[in-house]
């Protein structure tokens, strides 16, 4: 356990990197503009280099290339300053471990398996035949319905809900208000009304998955909706039924993924993206915020953007320049057409 105050040499002994200057003690990570003498900050983007000279930070995490410009400052030199900053921040904010015990107001149904190492909070509910791994934290008002299986050290924050029959891997974290395994939007038209199709699948989340607040992942119609290991999904995201999301993909807030979409691994999907259903998105695809994805993306590594229609990012950027000039261009086009028409009339 790292102490609340630690030296640069202690940090580098734990995380690697090279410290330069004085082996000072620091207490927390802060932005360059806010940092004081007891804080450590970081420079990940060269455009903020000028802020380093004005910063009161006691120490700064920089790349080897940037370090040469900051002689006299206390530094930690790292290959990836942003990643290193994240790891230092984790040192000062360690993961909270479960305090074993079940709150008197919690309900644990018969047949549920709850190891003594688990923490079950006030008014939490554990359904019949559900199995929890070691060290789980099911916090106040969280619900795990019947026949679920949770791996070790899963965290359900207050008011998170996991519907029946779902499976969560190890070290999964579900934030407040998220719902895992609600019914998918499956309906058949019966001539004068809609007939609901029973959603008999479930949801399976891999290891190290994190789901943001008020995000919904619908259960599959017949087979499971799945999310791969290490994938991180932001707040207020909708994942439709039967979706298959690969490993280590990130999806930002307010994105809607329609039913039966397959998303590869290591994809980056920006905020406010919307997709049609029944398409495939290849591995390592990057989709810019607000993009409408209307067809499959079959080539790995593409960077796409565009409100409508979606296109290659470079093509969209070029076209976007002209959007604000469309009215002017239309007037010029009409003028040219009129001039051409007048020219023909005089011939």
Swiss-Prot record:
Cellular component annotations (GO), alphabetically ordered: membrane
Gene Ontology MF annotations: N-acyltransferase activity
Record InterPro entries: Hexapep (IPR001451), Hexapep_transf_CS (IPR018357), LpxD (IPR007691), Trimer_LpxA-like_sf (IPR011004), UDP_GlcNAc_AcTrfase_non-rep (IPR020573)
Catalytic reactions of this protein: a UDP-3-O-[(3R)-3-hydroxyacyl]-alpha-D-glucosamine + a (3R)-hydroxyacyl-[ACP] = a UDP-2-N,3-O-bis[(3R)-3-hydroxyacyl]-alpha-D-glucosamine + holo-[ACP] + H(+)
Gene3D superfamilies in alphabetical order: 1.20.5.170, Hexapeptide repeat proteins, MurE/MurF, N-terminal domain
Residues in coiled coil: none
Pfam families associated with the record: Hexapep (PF00132), LpxD (PF04613)
EC number: 2.3.1.191
Any single GO BP term: lipid A biosynthetic process
The organism's place on the tree of life at top rank: Bacteria
Pathway(s): Bacterial outer membrane biogenesis; LPS lipid A biosynthesis
Keywords tagged on the record: Acyltransferase, Lipid A biosynthesis, Lipid biosynthesis, Lipid metabolism, Repeat, Transferase
Active site: 241 (proton acceptor)
Enzyme class name: transferase
HAMAP family from the UniProt entry: LpxD (MF_00523)
Function: Catalyzes the N-acylation of UDP-3-O-acylglucosamine using 3-hydroxyacyl-ACP as the acyl donor. Is involved in the biosynthesis of lipid A, a phosphorylated glycolipid that anchors the lipopolysaccharide to the outer membrane of the cell.
Subunit structure: Homotrimer.
Record family assignment: Belongs to the transferase hexapeptide repeat family. LpxD subfamily.
Entry protein name: UDP-3-O-acylglucosamine N-acyltransferase
Native species: Neisseria gonorrhoeae (strain ATCC 700825 / FA 1090)
């Amino acid at each position: 356990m790292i102490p609340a105050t630690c030296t640069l040499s202690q940090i580098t002994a734990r995380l690697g990197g090279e410290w330069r200057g004085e082996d000072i003690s620091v207490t927390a990570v802060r932005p360059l503009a806010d940092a004081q003498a007891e804080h450590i900050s970081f420079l990940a983007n060269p455009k903020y280099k000028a802020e380093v000279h004005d910063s009161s930070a006691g120490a700064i995490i920089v790349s080897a290339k940037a370090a040469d410009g900051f002689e006299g400052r206390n530094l930690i030199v790292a290959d990836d300053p942003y990643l290193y900053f994240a790891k230092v921040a984790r040192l000062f904010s360690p993961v909270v471990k479960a305090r074993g015990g079940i709150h008197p107001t919690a309900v644990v149904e018969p047949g549920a398996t709850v190891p003594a190492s688990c923490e079950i909070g006030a008014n939490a509910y554990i359904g019949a035949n559900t199995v929890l791994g070691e060290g789980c934290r099911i916090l106040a008002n969280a619900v795990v319905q019947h026949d679920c299986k949770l791996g070790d050290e899963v965290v359900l924050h207050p008011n998170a809900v996991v519907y029946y029959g779902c499976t969560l891997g190890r070290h999964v974290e579900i934030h407040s208000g998220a719902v895992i395994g609600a019914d998918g939007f499956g309906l058949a038209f019966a001539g004068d009304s809609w007939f609901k199709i029973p959603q008999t699948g479930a949801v399976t989340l891999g290891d190290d998955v994190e789901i943001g607040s008020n995000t919904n992942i619908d259960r599959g119609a017949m087979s499971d909706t799945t999310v791969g290991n290490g994938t991180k999904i932001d707040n207020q995201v909708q994942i439709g039924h039967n979706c298959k999301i690969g490993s280590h993909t990130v999806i930002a807030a307010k994105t809607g993924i329609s039913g039966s979409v397959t998303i590869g691994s290591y994809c980056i999907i920006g905020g406010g993206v919307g997709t049609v259903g029944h398409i495939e998105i290849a591995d390592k695809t990057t989709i810019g915020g607000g993009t409408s994805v209307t067809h499959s993306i079959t080539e790995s590594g593409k960077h796409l953007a565009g409100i409508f229609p979606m296109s290659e990012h470079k093509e969209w950027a070029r076209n976007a320049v002209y959007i604000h000039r469309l009215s002017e261009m239309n007037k010029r086009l009409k003028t040219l057409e009129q001039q051409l028409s007048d020219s023909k009339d005089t011939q």
